[in-house]
Amino acid sequence: MKDNFYISTAIVYTSSKPHLGNTYDVVLADVIARYKRLRGYDVYFQTGTDEHGEKIELKARENNILPQEYVDNIASCVKDVWDSLNTSYDKFVRTTNSKHKELASKIFDKLYEKGDIYKGNYKGLYCVPCESFWTESQLVSGNCPDCGRPVKEASEECYFFKTSNYSRWLYDYIEGHPGFIEPESRKNEIINNFIKPGLQDLCVSRTTFKWGIPVSFDSNHVIYVWIDALSNYITFLGYDPCGPSSLEFKKYWPCDLHMIGKDILRFHAIYWPIILHCLGLEMPKKIFAHPWLLFSNDKMSKSKGNIVYAEDLISKYGVDAVRFYLLHDIPFGSDGNYTEELFIDSINTNLANVFGNLVNRTIGMANKYFSGKITNIKEYADVDKELVDLVLSLDSKIENDINNVRISDSLDKIMEVYRRCNKYIDETEPWVLYKENKLDRLNTVIYNLIESIRIATVFLQAYLPDTANEIFKQLNTDINTMDSVLEFGQYNSNMIGEASPLFKRIEK
């Protein structure tokens, strides 16, 4: 029986069209989902859109359309962008879905019945863009600590979730489960900035707008975003707090990995675990808060006029060029930076020079020197063994990196093999071997290159699926499974295909 693996991304808020920075976590999650499928896991990959709230109600009014029409348009746009990025999600969810609304309402009712939700009055500070409440001490220079924009005074009747009752439980759970929140620096922020000072009860309903799921027993209130949006991870699996849950829920929950942006870690690492605890459910196994993608070292925002859209880059440079930049050039644990110059440099340096050039040269030599017919001769010189050992080390290295969500590191290890192959060509000088009529040695060199490319490309399928498929086509092989990377020499003497440029250099 295959092991199950459930990975989710944060659902995208449908107040506006997604920009390049919004695509980062879904592409990261896609790599992990594809990799786990290659490993034989039964993967469930969920993503989607968060479609309720005050900001959406205001945006719809500005556009003179109903909120449902507004979110329909944005959700369709998000799905199109995710599809254009070649993401392999299993379910694209929307919180305006009728079944989700029914189950989220039941979750709210269940928490109320248990005494974990009570009615009160809120008076304090509120950020409309983030839909977050703040205390004076949490502000940064008088503004929202998440987005930096001004907050406003707010006063209204609402229902509160008794998060303050669970500070000790949450602290003990986090400390008792290393790896539950990663990276470690983010875990420390959650503990030191929020849990140790003492959690405040959380406002979980609103009365100042109507675009949301009504509270079933109090029609003046709508369920606030945190119970509505966070519950998507279980409602779309068929969790029902009042009756039998679905087989799908029993199969995949708890989630193996919540992939989210660092700006929403507070909600996933504090409120979500407490909600699950109150419902008597298991915790997700890991919550990973990834860094941001910045534009010229500044956060992307419409107000700053520095928005870049993924679909524009895809139409200009191709989907795998965009995926590569997101996956390779944003370092583990720190914010990445986008400029068009950096993007083009990465394509030229990594994809055209290292990667495309290697495949083109290798296939070209196989056809030129042996009319495309290469045989496996297992007699290795020291320089061969160094290459082979590096290639065979990929399996354990990438497994470790993927399990630790070090995606950029893992992709660079694949690139290291391609770079080493280029160096191997310089070291072995195939053109000299041909000139000196050392054809057996020449055959071995070219075979080692082909097999090294093939094995590295088996892993590449998780990162750049279209490019990987094209390489296998040019190598004329279908030996592309994970069990074929454990032993060097699986390439089976096919008549190799014709070389075709994978990536072209871009002139600035």
Regions found by a protein language model. Name each.
Residues M1-N4, G48, G120-L125, P129, ...:
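Basic, alpha-helical terminal appendages of large translation-related enzymes
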Residues M1-T47, R94, K99-L103, P129, ...:
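Structured secondary-structure scaffolds
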Residues V31, E69, N73-D80, K106, ...:
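A non-catalytic, amphipathic alpha-helix used as a structural packing/dimerization or gating element
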Residues T49-K55:
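Short, charge-patterned binding micro-sites
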Residues K59-D72:
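A charged helix-plus-loop insertion that forms the helical arch/lid used to bind
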Residues Y70-Y126:
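A broadly conserved sequence feature marking short terminus-proximal activation segments
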Residues T135, K152-E153:
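Short functional micro-motifs and their immediate structural scaffolds
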Residues L265, L326-D329, G333, T339-L342, ...:
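Active-site-proximal binding-pocket segments
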